[in-house]
């Protein structure tokens, strides 16, 4: 049930002419017993209606109630005419007589009305029109209108009868509009416009309200039409209504109480009940046809036409209903929609303003979105056009991004990858080839976009006319201590090996040597097992490999590794059997061992050149150089010096005062000072170049090594370098490569396998040695890192926190302190004040210049992480023979040593009936009265046990000691 607020009730009362302020209305409602607090309080509809009726009954003027009528009754206006003199009413039985009523004076009207000749005929014409009426009549079931009107008998005029008081006012019927003061029908000429009164009511004189239904009007020569025929004899006649105050009232005529109707505001129809008929009143049905409109009579302002209002649902939903009061539909417009130009021209300014207000009130508001129903036609799947089924990606793309681009579920893509044998997650990066495979499976085409390195580093076609002969690049490889560097010293006529730590080479050395056969570039690689990556890089950039094998040692593991690296690079191998001057040298045994690796000497019918040489006596060195020159001629080594330079990084390091220094080998073009180059994720401009002798050079032709200064960082050994147009282009290429590397690292996800978990469980609870590695050159740092990682065992692992080149800095110390690790420096030293900072942070710094010494020391540190094994070592036994009680010491067990030795402060166990009753330590050990350190077998002594006095004869005391045994890494 809906509610109504107090201020809305006040507005409704105001429409009925009752002016009440909000405070007065609240006090009135409280007086009537309603629980309200302010003008915003709410009342139920039935409560509001009851309060409205009560207040209206108290404040409205008393008037005779109009005859109740059904819904749809319309009270029309009546024309004002001259009232004829009213006849005096005849006295009625059992009722008081009425006073004689004087005739009304002629009243001004809107139109001149002709006098009526035959009042009886006019009365018949002035009958009310047929209007819908409820099924049940308030008069006690009077039949519906449509019966023929019957003339009523004329009542005799009353003689000086007192006026009858007006009946109490009844509530107005909401379906009836208040009419203007009407005139008797007998005073209107035929055809004059007359507004009919309520059904069954004859109008009275001008200025008099119509009587209640069934009231008999008076007038000269006018008989009321009474349903049911003439009145029966003896039936009392209805009294005449008193004339109201106002124009046309006769002097001395009694008037009904109440205010002047002209001062009232338009309200619902009100009437004064004079009397009710004793017989049912039938409604008169006028003849069908067009009605004649009559001018309205003077009097109170009449209400406008009756409008039929429509109940519409609210635009905001919430199951509310509102009354549509819009007038736009009468003008052919829809509320809330734009007005056409023609309609706007036809309206006045005031109407346009009203229309604008109405349109503003009808702004359409979107309601709740309806859920799609399952009914209807089947959804049609549309296919994309071919030009829209193209996906553009860069080097890599994640599975989720690819699924969004294709409009395919990520689970479907992962399923396809699993079917192809690739495990991937939704956020994992996949390369362009894998993305192209998935795109093809779902009908899409993949195109690469973004940065193209070829735009900055284009491939240049080889111009045969500009090619010149370049020197060969020869890499010397072999096992450690087989004389590789000594052989190069003999060729260069230098003594490099004597200056190397431990007499071994630990990074690549590049040298350009002038020989009688021409210039040759030699690369000296380390032979230690830790420098595998260096040997592989040397094999990739070389034209010829000289494999050095000691005649007294034979083929060793690194010899085999060098053979495999050279074959993998597709490089020609030339074997130099060194140290033939030493006693016990057997070159034939070496040649026999090499045949197992498909290296057969020419002397034995093979294709491999094998020469016996001696670095000490320089035996066989000229023949070696001749064979190198012969092989270079066979290979036809040529290059174009006019191209932009390109090549490979042989070694890189970070020197104090010089910055990043890279040793590069120029393979194509000519490298000049000032060139902008890029290598890996680093770039820069060549600031200076130096050869192997430390001399600065301005340009380097192809086939020669050189040290380059001016890079933004330390490059990775083995990376290619290229010269580009300017430094800006070099920076863009380097940044693109760095971004690509970052995405690759993020996409690579390493998951722990069961083997990793078992290995961690077997490693003593996951003991790990954290290490920070710093070296002089990038290759050495890489070699040390790999060597330390290989030193890890099942019990203790090795984790490299960081690795780099250059001096040990404060940042390295803080990194090691955060990871509770150590710092390993190889061929480098810490900066000033770094040792004191490391001591404060509790970080150990280990410095080495020989790699195998570094590995041995790291293994010791790893073993120190393992907890020692506690082992029990038996000492001896003693049997308790007697007990002695000594003050402050308690019971002393007089015992005889039966086995081994009993030492003071040794751990003991007391056994009684072969069961341990106590374990502790010896507190005192005496021989007679002297304290002794130990007692041997066969002697008696007194033994005092700490915290135990319940010793009994026959107990056995076992003495033992605990010793710690350091665990082994194996």
Curated annotation (Swiss-Prot):
Instruction: Report the Pfam families cross-referenced here.
Output: EF-G_D2, GTP_EFTU, IF-2, IF2_N
Spans annotated as G2: 503-507
Region (G3), start-end ranges? 524-527
Give yes or no: UniProt keyword Protein biosynthesis: yes
Q: Where is this region: G1?
A: 478-485
Q: Name one GO cellular component term.
A: cytosol
Q: Where in the cell is it found?
A: Cytoplasm
Entry keywords, A to Z: Cytoplasm, GTP-binding, Initiation factor, Nucleotide-binding, Protein biosynthesis
G5 as annotated region, ranges: 614-616
Region Disordered, residue ranges: 54-270, 328-348
Determine if Nucleotide-binding is one of this entry's keywords: yes
Q: Quote the record's binding site residues for GTP.
A: 478-485, 524-528, 578-581
Q: Where is the signal peptide?
A: none
- Pinpoint the tr-type G domain residues: 469-638
Q: Where is the composition biased (Polar residues)?
A: 98-112
* Positions of region (G4): 578-581
Q: Which GO terms describe its molecular function?
A: GTP binding; GTPase activity; translation initiation factor activity
**Role, per record:** One of the essential components for the initiation of protein synthesis. Protects formylmethionyl-tRNA from spontaneous hydrolysis and promotes its binding to the 30S ribosomal subunits. Also involved in the hydrolysis of GTP during the formation of the 70S ribosomal complex.
Q: What is this protein called?
A: Translation initiation factor IF-2
């Amino acid at each position: 049930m809906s509610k109504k607020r107090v201020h809305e009730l006040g507005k409704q009362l105001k429409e009925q002419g009752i002016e009440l302020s909000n405070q007065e209305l609240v006090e009135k409602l409280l007086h009537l017993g309603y629980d309200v607090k302010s003008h915003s309080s709410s009342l139920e509809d039935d409560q509001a209606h009851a309060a409205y009726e009560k207040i209206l009954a108290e404040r409205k003027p008393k008037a005779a109630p109009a005859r109740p009528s059904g819904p749809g009754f319309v009270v029309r206006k009546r024309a004002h005419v001259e009232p004829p003199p009213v006849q005096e009413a005849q006295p009625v039985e059992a009722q008081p007589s009425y006073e004689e009523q004087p005739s009304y004076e002629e009243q001004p009207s809107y139109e001149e009305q002709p006098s009526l000749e035959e009042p009886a005929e006019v009365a018949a014409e002035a009958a009310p029109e047929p209007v819908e009426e409820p099924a049940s009549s308030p008069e006690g079931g009077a039949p519906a209108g449509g019966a023929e009107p019957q003339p009523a008998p004329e009542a005799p005029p009353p003689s000086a009868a007192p006026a009858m008081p007006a009946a109490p006012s009844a509530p107005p019927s909401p379906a009836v509009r208040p009419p203007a003061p009407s005139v008797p029908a007998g005073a209107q000429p035929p055809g004059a416009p007359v507004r009919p009164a309520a059904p069954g009511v004859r109008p009275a004189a001008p200025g008099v309200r119509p009587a209640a239904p069934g009231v008999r009007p008076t007038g000269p020569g006018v008989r009321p039409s009474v349903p049911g025929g003439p009145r029966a004899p003896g039936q009392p006649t209805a009294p005449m209504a008193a004339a109201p105050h106002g124009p046309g009232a006769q002097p001395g005529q009694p008037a009904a109480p109440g205010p002047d109707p002209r001062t009232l505001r338009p309200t619902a129809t009100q009437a004064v009940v004079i009397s009710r008929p004793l017989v049912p009143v039938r409604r008169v049905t006028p003849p069908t046809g067009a009605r004649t409109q009559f001018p309205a009579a003077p009097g109170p302002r009449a209400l406008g036409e009756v409008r039929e209002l429509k109940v519409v649902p609210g635009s905001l939903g919430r199951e509310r209903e509102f009354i549509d009061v819009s007038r736009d539909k009468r003008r052919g417009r829809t509320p809330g929609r734009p007005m056409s130009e023609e309609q706007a021209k036809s309206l006045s300014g005031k109407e346009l303003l009203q229309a604008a207000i109405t349109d503003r009130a009808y702004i359409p508001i979107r309601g709740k979105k309806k859920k799609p129903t399952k009914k209807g036609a089947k959804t049609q799947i549309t296919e994309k056009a071919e030009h829209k089924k193209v996906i553009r990606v860069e080097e890599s793309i994640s599975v989720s991004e690819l699924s969004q681009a294709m409009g395919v579920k990520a689970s479907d893509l992962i399923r396809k990858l699993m079917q192809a044998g690739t495990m991937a997650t939704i956020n994992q990066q996949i390369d362009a080839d894998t993305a192209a495979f998935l795109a093809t499976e779902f009908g899409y085409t993949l195109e690469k976009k973004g940065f193209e390195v070829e735009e900055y580093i284009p491939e240049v076609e080889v111009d045969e006319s500009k090619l010149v002969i370049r020197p060969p690049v020869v890499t010397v490889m072999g096992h450690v201590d087989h004389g590789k560097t000594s052989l190069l010293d003999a060729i260069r006529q230098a003594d490099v090996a004597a200056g190397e730590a431990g007499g071994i080479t630990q990074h690549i050395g590049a040298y350009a040597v002038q020989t009688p056969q021409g210039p040759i570039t030699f690369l000296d690689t380390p032979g230690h097992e830790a420098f595998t990556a260096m040997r592989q890089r040397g094999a990739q950039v070389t034209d010829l490999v000289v494999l050095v094998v000691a005649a007294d040692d034979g083929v060793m593991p690194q010899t085999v590794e060098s053979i495999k690296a050279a074959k993998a690079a597709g490089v020609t191998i030339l074997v130099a059997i060194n140290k033939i001057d030493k006693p016990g040298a057997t070159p034939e045994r070496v040649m026999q061992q090499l045949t197992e690796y498909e290296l057969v000497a020419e002397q034995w019918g093979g294709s491999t050149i094998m020469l016996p040489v001696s670095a000490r006596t320089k035996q066989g060195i000229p023949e070696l150089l001749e064979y190198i020159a012969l092989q270079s001629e066979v290979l036809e080594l040529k290059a174009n010096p006019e191209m932009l330079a390109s090549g490979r990084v042989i070694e890189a390091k970070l020197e104090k005062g010089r910055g990043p220094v890279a040793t590069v080998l120029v393979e194509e073009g000519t490298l000049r000072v000032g060139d902008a180059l890029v290598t890996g994720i680093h770039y820069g401009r060549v600031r200076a170049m130096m050869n192997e002798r430390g001399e600065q050079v301005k340009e380097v032709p192809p086939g020669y090594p050189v040290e380059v200064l001016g890079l933004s960082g330390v490059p990775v050994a083995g990376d290619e370098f290229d010269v580009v147009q300017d430094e800006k282009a070099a920076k863009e290429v380097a940044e693109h490569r760095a971004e690509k590397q970052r995405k690759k690292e993020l996409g690579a996800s390493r998951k722990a396998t069961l083997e990793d978990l078992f290995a961690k469980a077997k490693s003593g609870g996951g003991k790990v040695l954290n290490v920070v590695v710093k070296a002089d050159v990038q290759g050495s740092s890489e070699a040390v890192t790999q060597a330390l990682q290989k030193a890890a065992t099942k019990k203790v692992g090795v984790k490299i926190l960081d690795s780099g080149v250059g001096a040990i800095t404060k940042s390295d110390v803080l990194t090691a302190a955060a990871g509770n690790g150590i710092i390993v420096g190889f061929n480098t030293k810490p900066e000033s004040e770094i040792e004191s900072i490391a001591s404060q942070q509790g970080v150990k710094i280990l410095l080495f210049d020989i790699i195998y010494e570094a590995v041995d020391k790291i293994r010791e540190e790893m073993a120190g992480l393992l907890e020692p094994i506690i082992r029990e070592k038996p000492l001896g036994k003693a049997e308790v023979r007697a007990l002695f009680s000594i003050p402050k010491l308690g019971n002393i067990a007089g015992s005889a040593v039966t086995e081994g030795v009993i030492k003071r402060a040794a751990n003991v166990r007391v056994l009684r009936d072969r069961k341990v009753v106590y374990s502790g330590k010896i507190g005192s050990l005496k021989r007679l009265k002297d304290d002794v350190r130990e007692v041997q077998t066969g002697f008696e002594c007194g033994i005092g046990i700490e915290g135990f006095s319940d010793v009994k004869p026959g107990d056995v005391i076992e003495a033992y000691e605990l010793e710690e045994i350091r665990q082994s890494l194996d």
